[in-house]
């Protein structure tokens, strides 16, 4: 492993394709030590609240995340030390008692809707990516995902999108585009942008090896 891991931040609105872009990067480097860390793993522990209070959680607001812990653990990984990353129980709307061990890698993809919102987290990143997708495309994906995977009704998904997801996107997420080094319109279907990005990452990895 090289001396310091490369940290790549990938953000964008819910349903915008950031996870697909992250997976495209992962698949492009099958022989590298590369892992993805999701901001969603760091939703705050809400075990002190009643279930009725927990179900009202606004998961698209910065306050929902324990970003302090994420920053602390990324710093540990940068120092070459393993960490135990939390997991979140969406059924109970609180942090699970389970964790998973993340070993040091050469590259980490830090993915989530608000990973560019906190300057302390941005400052740890070598490449910052914003996946820019039209509202109409994002809501169509969100409806499909929530109805097929979570069994939710069309009305409930649309109401959540209009009442929470869309306003939070425009209040907190869209503005972080200005911090991005690379903006990828239309996500993973933009093969030119993906090719340019993976070429840049490969160059950074090669330079790191040659500097040893």
UniProtKB/Swiss-Prot annotation:
GO cellular component, one term: cytoplasm
GO molecular function terms noted in the UniProt entry: ATP binding; cytidine kinase activity; uridine kinase activity
GO biological process entries: CTP salvage; UMP salvage
CDD domains: UMPK (cd02023)
Keyword Nucleotide-binding: yes
Family: Belongs to the uridine kinase family.
SUPFAM superfamilies noted in UniProt: P-loop containing nucleoside triphosphate hydrolases (SSF52540)
Annotated Pfam families: PRK
Disulfide bond residue pairs: none
Enzyme class: transferase
EC assignment: 2.7.1.48
Stated name of the protein: Uridine kinase
Location within or outside the cell: Cytoplasm
Reaction catalyzed: uridine + ATP = UMP + ADP + H(+); cytidine + ATP = CMP + ADP + H(+)
Keywords: ATP-binding, Cytoplasm, Kinase, Nucleotide-binding, Transferase
Native source organism of the sequence: Streptococcus pneumoniae serotype 19F (strain G54)
InterPro entries membership: P-loop_NTPase (IPR027417), PRK/URK (IPR006083), Uridine_kinase (IPR026008), Uridine_kinase-like (IPR000764)
Origin superkingdom: Bacteria
Pathway: Pyrimidine metabolism; CTP biosynthesis via salvage pathway; CTP from cytidine: step 1/3; Pyrimidine metabolism; UMP biosynthesis via salvage pathway; UMP from uridine: step 1/1
Binding residues for ATP: 12-19
């Amino acid at each position: 492993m090289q001396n310091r891991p490369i940290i790549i931040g990938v953000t964008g609105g819910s349903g915008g394709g950031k996870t697909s872009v992250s997976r495209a990067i992962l698949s492009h480097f099958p022989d590298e030590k590369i892992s993805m860390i999701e901001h969603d793993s760091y939703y705050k522990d809400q075990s002190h609240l009643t279930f009725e209070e927990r179900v009202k959680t606004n998961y698209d607001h910065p306050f929902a995340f324990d970003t302090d812990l994420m920053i602390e653990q990324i710093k540990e990984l940068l120092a070459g030390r393993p960490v135990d990353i939390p997991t979140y129980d969406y059924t109970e709307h609180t942090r699970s008692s389970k964790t998973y061990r993340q070993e040091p890698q050469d590259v980490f993809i830090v993915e989530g809707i608000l990973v560019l919102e906190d300057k302390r987290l941005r400052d740890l990143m070598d490449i910052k990516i914003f996946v820019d997708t039209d509202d109409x495309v994002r809501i169509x994906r969100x409806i499909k995902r929530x109805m097929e995977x979570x069994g939710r009704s069309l009305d409930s998904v649309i109401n959540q999108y209009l009442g929470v997801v869309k306003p939070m996107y425009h209040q907190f997420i869209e503005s972080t585009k200005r911090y991005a080094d690379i903006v990828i319109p239309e996500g993973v279907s933009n093969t030119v942008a993906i090719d340019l990005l993976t070429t840049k990452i490969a160059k950074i990895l090669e330079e790191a090896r040659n500097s040893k």
